[in-house]
Amino acid sequence: MANIDYSFENSIPIGPLKIAALDSCKDFAKKVDDYIVSFRQHDAEALAQRQSMLDFRGYDSKSYLLDFSCPRFGSGEAKCVLKESVRGSDIFAMVDVTNYSLTYQLCGEVNHMSPDNHYQDLKRLIGSCRGARRVNVVMPFCMRAVSISVPEENLLTVHWH
């Protein structure tokens, strides 16, 4: 990736960054995480001056990947289990709903995950991140975007990328 000459002298992070990569997007999320870690290490001078500021807690990290899992039960149902706190964090949930290569067991049979299975796991993750400051979704294929019709006065701050 290209080097970008950018410093954070005039900006403050929203909250500690966490990348929540669902199984369908783990490889890509790892590349994003590696890039952000190296990018932020180059900003060490600005960070050293601000380490005592509360806004910069968690800014310098060896990895921003969130530790969580979405285990499935024998019935095919699943749940999201967070293994670390997300309170006050800026979460970026990454999912590839068109990744058909993932499988799960249902009544002893192997099933491939459909776009809807991936989407349901994403909803489980979002539901478990209630204490986060902000949740952003990085989803290359937004299957329900055209069917959502929300009156303007009811709009929420949800970032779909």
Feature map (PLM): residue ranges:
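PRPP-associated nucleotide enzymes
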Residues: M1-H161
